[in-house]
């Protein structure tokens, strides 16, 4: 009886594992993106962690939350997480998110907004964005513009960094 039960359990577990593996490979890149938290690293080594929550009122739209860790050389507010928020439209993979550079560690008195799209056409997914950084240069407000390309990262960000 125990041998039969063990064989049935083994077959059942193997069947579930095979189904989960097949489902993961059949899932579109867009759906994998929405399945949980994902980390994206840009050319400066900065990390954006996104969590997508379905909008209760807008179809195919997701609220974006998470953290951004700035690692760009020559900038302030580095190495510590800042909350990010935004929106994602899954109909054509368009995203917009922003960060206010103020937390318990530092206040850089500035804000950055990124707008872009996810490109799933290559062997590795890319998030292509344009950004605007609003800040004060002395006593004069200014806006700096640029572009970031983020690559999805399989590395995890330390939980302590994400909760600071």
From Swiss-Prot:
Provide this UniProt record's keywords sorted from A to Z. Answer: Biotin, Disulfide bond, Secreted, Signal
Tell me which residues bind biotin.
42, 46, 68, 70, 76, 110, 112, 148
Biotech use, in short, is:
The specific properties of hoefavidin make it an attractive target for novel biotechnological applications, including drug delivery, nanotechnology, and molecular labeling.
Q: Where is this protein found?
A: Secreted
Q: What SUPFAM superfamilies does this protein map onto? A: Avidin/streptavidin
Keyword Lyase among record annotations: no
Which GO cellular component does the record give, naming just one?
extracellular region
Q: Which Pfam families match?
A: Avidin
One of the record's GO molecular function terms: protein homodimerization activity
Q: List the disulfide bonds.
A: 77-108
Temperature dependence as stated in the record: Is hyperthermostable. Displays a Tm value of 84.9 degrees Celsius, which increases to 96.2 degrees Celsius upon biotin binding.
Outline the extent of the Avidin-like domain: 32-155
Please classify the protein's predominant subcellular localization into one broad category: secreted
Q: Span of the secretion signal? A: 1-22
Asked if Secreted is a keyword of the record, the answer is yes
The text of the family note is: Belongs to the avidin/streptavidin family.
Q: What is known of its domains?
A: The C-terminal segment plays a key role in the formation and stabilization of the octameric configuration, since the short afifavidin (lacking the last 5 amino acids) is only dimeric.
| Oligomer and partners | Exhibits a dynamic oligomeric assembly: the apo form exits as homooctamers, which dissociate into homodimers upon biotin binding. The X-ray structure of the intact hoefavidin reveals unique crystal packing generated by an octameric cylindrical structure wherein the C-terminal segments of each monomer are introduced into the entrance of the biotin-binding site of an adjacent non-canonical monomer.
Q: What does this protein do?
A: The exact role played by hoefavidin in the host organism is still obscure. Forms a strong non-covalent complex with biotin and 2-iminobiotin.
Name assigned to this protein = Hoefavidin
